[in-house]
Structures are given as C-alpha cells and as structure tokens.
Amino acid sequence: MNVVCHIRYEIDPHRRAAFEEYARNWLSIIPACGGELLGYFMPHEGTNNIAHAMIGFGSLAAYEAYRTRLKSDPAGKVNFEFAERERLILREERTFLRPVRK
C-alpha cells in the first residue's frame, strides 16, 4: 500500500445510524472492487457529525481503476443511491496520503 485515500465525511448528526448502515455496506463492496479497506470510523465522543474512512491502494492509478469498478458495481450503485436518497452526507473531502516508512 503506497497511497491511502482518507475520506472525511460531514454527516447529519441525526442520521448517524443510517450513515453507519451506509458505511457497513462498503465493508464488502470496497474490497471486491480492489480497495484495501483500513476502516470506516464513526463519531464516538466529541464532535458528532464527522466520520472517516481510509482505503489503501498501490498507486493513484490503482485508485482510479478502483473508482471505475466501483461506479459500475451493482451493490456500489445501490449504496451511492441510498446515501443520496437519505441525504446522509453533507460534505465529503478526500485527501491522499502516503505512509511514512523507515
């Protein structure tokens, strides 16, 4: 894993349970489409409207290929539509990170 896509979600705090369902759906979809899912993380203490996800890839090109597969994946389409219909995500930011190695 050379690149980590960190996704910061601003979510509706009154829709946390629905967002958690959305996140749980990705737990099988993302690996099936080629992402190395490090996890989805829900608010626990403190800020109640910020969630995170981290997904690893060998390269940015691998990320782009993953995004193409994800957009055509039937379960992925259903989950994207679920989030849109339920208005779970108010804002989404992606940052690409690299691991620090010895």
Predicted regions and their residues:
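Residues at or immediately preceding the N-termini of alpha-helices
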Residues: 15-16, 60
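An amphipathic, aromatic/His-enriched active-site/gating alpha helix that lines ligand/cofactor pockets
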Residues: 21-38, 56-93
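Short, low-order "capping/linker" segments at domain edges
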Residues: 93-102
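Short, structured motif recognition centered on aromatic/hydrophobic residues
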Residues: 3-8, 19, 30, 51-54
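Short acidic/glycine-enriched loop/turn segments that link adjacent beta-strands
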Residues: 46-49
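Absolute protein N-terminus
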Residues: 1-2, 102
